[in-house]
Amino acid sequence: GGDADVVLTYGRPGDVILVGDWDGDGTDTFAVRRGNTYHVKNSMRGGDADAVFHYGRENDAVMVGDWDGNGTDTFAVRRAATYHVKNSLRGGDADTVFTYGRAADITLAGDWDGDGRDTFTVRRGATYHVSNSLRGGAPDTVVTFGRAGDEVHVGDWDGNGTDTLGVRRPVGPAPVAKEVRSAAK
């Protein structure tokens, strides 16, 4: 409980909010995506963006990660099963393009092997196909974890520098209280 440490206004209603360490200072801040335009902020204050650029297409799925291990987060966009990875906060061509998984897969980004570089895992139901490099082909590891309907989160839960999976499982509908009264006359 209690009051927030920081309250700020940034972006517009309908913007997609993204979080990352854009300038490598060790602090995550916000970026907003409006279509294929990114507005990146390096501080927890409102006002103008520190960087504005176009990347990818409006309907691309976007992921945030430190793809090259330099300490700064940038964007990758996914189009079907093809990934377009950018290592700078600028428009233009991707630095790396590859196909991995299937178009219907769910993609998760994380540093799965603790080398300081984020890569992708694709999820099919409760099966995860983990790649430790930005390339197509066979996964480095295949793991079954949780259930197909679980909500999945990625994090370094124990502080060892390696991301792993965590799941949140809905426990079903909220209990319903029903009071039954007899109609006494």
Language-model features and meaning:
Residues 1-185:
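Trp/Gly-enriched beta-strand/coil motifs that build multi-repeat beta-propeller-like domains
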